Each structure stands twice: as C-alpha cells, then as structure tokens.
C-alpha cells in the first residue's frame, strides 16, 4: 500500500505565493488543494542537474497525463494557478487571501459527512488509481454492506426522510 492509502483521513492543503520543487511535491500528496490566484509553480530540479524524487514524476503524470507532466518536469517553466487548475494539480483557485478560509470550509463540509463513508470512498478512489478499476469495483458490495449496516447509514436515511441535517457518530 502506498503512503497515501495508509492515511485514513482526507488531506486538504492550501497554497499561496511561490510553490517550487518540494512545495509542489508536498501539494501533490494532498487529496484536495485550494490555491490562491497569485501562486507561481515550478518543478525546477532539472535546472539544478537533479531529478524530482519527492513524488512529482509520479503524481504529475497521474493527475495531468504524461505529456503535461513531462512539459513541466523537463522545462522547469514557471506556471500560474490557472495552469495548475487545468492540470488537476489544484482543485480550486480563489482570490489571494481566501485560500485558508476556502480550505477550512471544504474540510468542514467533509467533516459533516458520515466518517466511515468518507474514508471508504476515499480509499476506493485511491484503489482505482493504484490497482485499477476492477479492484475498486470488487470492493463495492462488501464495503457497501458494512456501511449499510452502520448506525450512520440509519441516521442518514432518517435525516433524509425527516428533511434535516444528519448527525453522524462514526458508528
């Protein structure tokens, strides 16, 4: 299992200003990233005669495709938040100064969901990426059975019927 899959919790990050080399690699290790609209990015190891070894070669290709990854890894060109968004390196771009508030708002919306369902969903997405869709699909029924028999699933249905926000317990 990768380190990403070993984490149970969703990691969200926010970036602002200059995000070069290891900054990009740390950012790409997060599940959800919010960037300020004034960010500058560059993966510049090749300018220093070395290779990016903190995960950029893997995660850039995973998120943006081989050609886009190689374009930025091999040229060390600087790019902005709009390009990072286009490449799926960041999931939201907000005006500078609002990135922390937006990241916290996303974290609060995730925290309001059923904890076991959040973990199961996140792990299934990562399994599909790392082991293929068939492996992820194979987990659908057994994982759904566990979740459907939980107190949180019962609370989710009750809350839907009663038209109120659910109060999940993690059980």
What is each model feature region?
Residues 156-171:
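Short, basic/aromatic-enriched C-terminal tail that caps enzymatic domains
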Residues 72-73, 121-125, 144, 160:
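Short alpha-helical scaffolding segments that buttress acidic/His motifs in well-ordered protein cores
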Residues 1-7, 11:
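Single conserved hydrophobic/aromatic residue that forms the stacking wall/gate
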Residues 34-39, 81, 90-138, 146-151, ...:
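C-terminal long alpha-helix characteristic of the crotonase
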Residues 76-83:
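Acidic, divalent-metal-coordinating active-site segment for phosphoryl/phosphodiester hydrolysis
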Residues 14, 20-74, 87, 102-106:
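CoA-thioester-processing core
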């Amino acid at each position: 299992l990768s380190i990403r899959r070993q984490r149970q919790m969703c990691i969200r990050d926010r970036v602002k200003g200059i995000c070069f080399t290891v900054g990009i690699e740390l950012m790409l290790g997060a599940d959800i990233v919010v960037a300020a609209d004034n960010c500058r990015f560059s993966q510049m190891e090749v300018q220093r005669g070395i290779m990016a070894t903190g995960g950029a070669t893997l995660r850039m290709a995973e998120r943006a495709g081989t050609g886009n990854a190689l374009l930025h890894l091999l040229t060390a060109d600087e790019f902005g938040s709009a390009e990072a968004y286009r490449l799926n390196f960041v999931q939201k771009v907000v005006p500078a100064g609002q990135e922390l508030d937006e990241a916290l708002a996303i974290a609060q919306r995730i925290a309001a969901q059923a904890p076991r369902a959040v973990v199961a969903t996140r792990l299934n997405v990562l399994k599909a990426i790392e082991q293929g869709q068939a492996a992820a699909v194979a987990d659908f029924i057994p994982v759904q059975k566990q979740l459907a028999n939980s107190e949180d699933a019962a609370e989710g249905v009750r809350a839907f019927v009663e038209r109120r926000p659910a109060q999940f317990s993690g059980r």
